Amino acid sequence: MSQALTLARPYARAAFAIAREGGKFAPWSDALAFSAQVAGDPRVAALLLNPALHQDQAVTLLAPPAAEADYQRFLGLLADAQRLALLPEIAGLYEQLRAEAEHVVKATVTSATDMSPAELATITAALKKRFGREVDVTTAVDASLIGGAVIDTGEMVIDGSLKGKLARLQNSLAH
């Protein structure tokens, strides 16, 4: 996994530079997400390894329907370098670069049950205050947490779940 990220990083930076130059962060995000989803399918991944598949066919397969010429050239570059399989990693790294440039912290809040809009607003405000930047929050539900929530920003994890508290209590009693 780390090798894939290492290989994907220069391509993500190149994609980001092209998007920044054209002021088209969102269209590139959408295009990369589409291509990453298609390339991540096991059947497509197997097809991409087929030597009979020509570069232009691979680009057509992976490009979104209304892809711009710059994006198609980018996919062609990846095809030339035999790096199309790295599209999921490239898309993830691109999103990290975009979030940094837009001064946005991406956070995932996983709770035991669905959160109310008021709870989500409180958490978002607290994260915004802590990081001093805008916060883009996505939510998930994991009933195994029992109660509370786990907040993951990539840089740090705040575990306020009952499951986590019980695990920490068990660990402290065991030692």
Curated annotation (Swiss-Prot):
Membrane topology: Peripheral membrane protein
Pfam family of the protein (one): OSCP
Domain of life: Bacteria
One function term, GO molecular function aspect: proton-transporting ATP synthase activity, rotational mechanism
InterPro entries with a match to the protein in the record: ATP_synth_OSCP/delta_N_sf (IPR026015), ATPase_OSCP/dsu (IPR000711)
UniProt keywords, alphabetically: ATP synthesis, Cell inner membrane, Cell membrane, CF(1), Hydrogen ion transport, Ion transport, Membrane, Transport
Gene3D superfamilies with a match to the protein in the record: N-terminal domain of the delta subunit of the F1F0-ATP synthase
Localization per record: Cell inner membrane
One of the GO BP terms on file: proton motive force-driven ATP synthesis
Primary subcellular site in the record, as a coarse category: membrane
Cellular component, GO annotation: plasma membrane; proton-transporting ATP synthase complex
Physiological role: F(1)F(0) ATP synthase produces ATP from ADP in the presence of a proton or sodium gradient. F-type ATPases consist of two structural domains, F(1) containing the extramembraneous catalytic core and F(0) containing the membrane proton channel, linked together by a central stalk and a peripheral stalk. During catalysis, ATP synthesis in the catalytic domain of F(1) is coupled via a rotary mechanism of the central stalk subunits to proton translocation.
Similarity comment: family membership: Belongs to the ATPase delta chain family.
Subunit-structure text: F-type ATPases have 2 components, F(1) - the catalytic core - and F(0) - the membrane proton channel. F(1) has five subunits: alpha(3), beta(3), gamma(1), delta(1), epsilon(1). F(0) has three main subunits: a(1), b(2) and c(10-14). The alpha and beta chains form an alternating ring which encloses part of the gamma chain. F(1) is attached to F(0) by a central stalk formed by the gamma and epsilon chains, while a peripheral stalk is formed by the delta and b chains.
Record's protein name: ATP synthase subunit delta
Taxonomic classification: Bacteria, Pseudomonadati, Pseudomonadota, Gammaproteobacteria, Lysobacterales
